[in-house]
Amino acid sequence: MFGRNFPFFNSIGGFYPRESLDSKRPSGTGYTSKVRVRDKYHIVGFISSGTYGRVYKAIGKDGRKGEYAIKKFKPDKEGEIIQYTGLSQSAIREMALCSELDHPNVVQLAEIILEDKCIFMVFEYTEHDLLQIIHHHTQPQRHAIPAPMIKSILFQLLNGLLYLHTNWVLHRDLKPANILVTSSGAVRIGDLGLARLFYKPLNSLYSGDKVVVTIWYRAPELLMGSRHYTPAVDLWAVGCIFAELLSLRPIFKGEEAKMDSKKTVPFQRNQMMKIIDIMGLPRKETWPGLVSMPEFSQLQSLAMSRGYLNRQCNLEGWYQSCLKNNGYSPGSAAGTPGAEGFDLLSRLLEYDPTKRISAREALEHPYFTTGTPVTANCFAGYEGKYPHRRVTQDDNDIRSGSLPGTKRSGLPDDSLMGRAAKRLKE
């Protein structure tokens, strides 16, 4: 299914051969036992922690050049007693998929190490992520993200997504924090903990994971309770990311309703309202499958109570306002995403998943094939500097015997969700 020679799609319809791209990963990535992490890597410091465990920055020893991010999974814990009852489904999926996937726009796994009942995933180190980049541009006296940089980021993201979808992999959690960027401007899709194969599933995708995709990037068919879904859910998330790169804030910033004690998934009323405010009310005339959605009656109730029955799409108004407020040049000049950018955004944010643009179609869109050429380095031509990822020396004990921790004072708790939660309060 997967292959190390999968081609790299380019903007003029050709392919870059995989062999021409540098990779730190040796062939046949798999599990390594009877070896200690510290024998192969020098631990520089601690990056972040979360429900999965902890992440550390490291440098290779004994001829292993380069920097690495080591994810240490923590075992189940009951009180002060660690119970080695196995790994989460998320960890197993991530290890299985990352061991097979190999593409320049998907995060690279170097190896997996088993040490004294602890599992370590060793990834290439990436200095930035899109959430960090977006946050940098929101600070006073800073400008919008340059249009050529957005084009390169989006192209590389779609290129990696095409590889995943071609190999029957749904990511299911695309968001700025999970889109990594190397110091040389290469974009990598990261965090495959919610990813899964969708080729001839034995059960509906809903039966395995009832809640997927962070709420601000969740596709309308998921909000409407669809029991089965397609790669189109990832393309909606790409549209949300595209909009966020342009506006420097989430386009659909709703509040998530949590599951009750019976683990019943509630209708995400507030998030659906945020989408309708910009996209208008979805209608069965343009989305025939809408009426069969489990939450259709909830949508009707929402439309009646909020006066949404005649709400029309205002995405173009939002787009033009965004360009004006962020100082992009009018028209289709090199310094603006232009009309082609709006057309691509509208196709990504299509309500009906059967009509939503695919990754392959998006890569062939005029937004990429006309105007300023796409660069392989998204930072090309940008004179500014982004801050390095925070690495602390306060807690860099990666030993398997050390107790895997959770949140600690002064340290980020799950950088992927913690920063998003902070922005929700703003």
Swiss-Prot record:
Keywords: Activator, ATP-binding, Kinase, Magnesium, Metal-binding, Nucleotide-binding, Nucleus, Repressor, Serine/threonine-protein kinase, Transcription, Transcription regulation, Transferase
InterPro entries (alphabetical): CDK, Kinase-like_dom_sf, Prot_kinase_dom, Ser/Thr_kinase_AS
Primary location recorded for the protein, binned into one broad class: nucleus
Gene3D superfamilies assigned: Phosphorylase Kinase, domain 1, Transferase(Phosphotransferase) domain 1
Protein kinase domain: residues covered: 41-368
Region (Disordered): 390-426
EC number: 2.7.11.22, 2.7.11.23
Annotated active site: D173
Subcellular location: Nucleus
GO MF assignments: ATP binding; cyclin-dependent protein serine/threonine kinase activity; metal ion binding; protein serine kinase activity; RNA polymerase II CTD heptapeptide repeat kinase activity
Keyword Calcium: no
Catalytic activity: L-seryl-[protein] + ATP = O-phospho-L-seryl-[protein] + ADP + H(+); L-threonyl-[protein] + ATP = O-phospho-L-threonyl-[protein] + ADP + H(+); [DNA-directed RNA polymerase] + ATP = phospho-[DNA-directed RNA polymerase] + ADP + H(+)
Class in the EC hierarchy, top level: transferase
Listed PROSITE patterns: PROTEIN_KINASE_DOM, PROTEIN_KINASE_ST
Annotated ATP binding sites: I47, S48, S49, G50, T51, Y52, G53, R54, V55, K71
Record-annotated disulphide pairs: none
Cofactor: Mg(2+)
Family from the record: Belongs to the protein kinase superfamily. CMGC Ser/Thr protein kinase family. CDC2/CDKX subfamily.
Quaternary structure note: Component of the srb8-11 complex, a regulatory module of the Mediator complex.
Protein's name in the database: Serine/threonine-protein kinase ssn3
UniProt gene name: ssn3
